[in-house]
Amino acid sequence: LLIKRVLDWGVGASNLVTYFFGVLAIGLLAYAAFHDVAARTVPNWLSLCLLALGAAVRLADHTLEAGLIIAGVTFVLLFAIWVLGLMGGGDVKLWAAATLLVPPDLHTEINFFFGVVLLGGLLGLVYLALRPVLRRVRAAGPAGRMAASRGLFARVLRAEAWRIDRRGPLPYACAISASAILTLLPLSFQL
């Protein structure tokens, strides 16, 4: 009934598919970011789901071939960066899958790419800024370290503090997901 009403309002099936898959993709991208912060991994099933969603959306708007070419080139270039040890494998797969979600026009793809780069740089600056703060918190003793805090969020914060203190890798899926979400939001909600 809802689909019939939406179609009666003049919204085409392609827009409805884009809207539905856009909402689903945004949820999966947010989950990828949170999972990367919590565990420093991006599950393969998540990248595969995003890849399938991207393929479905590109099929609906008749740009599957162009989307697959751009996602494939992205994967190959990022794979080379992974081989050099400069990026995690989960981030490579997530970025390639997210590239397929983004419409394959030059303007949108460039916005997505520079969004990832800029947000990744901002993430790096935040991590650099947090190092001195964490040193002061650690110097305050157990109370300063939130030793009494419980719950998932507190554990993630403690783990993140430990990673920052030891100069661990950045959760780059946050930058990839945020850029993809910022790119998809205006496109997904054009009902």
Residues of each region from the PLM?
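A membrane-topology feature that recognizes alpha-helical transmembrane segments
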Residues: 1-191
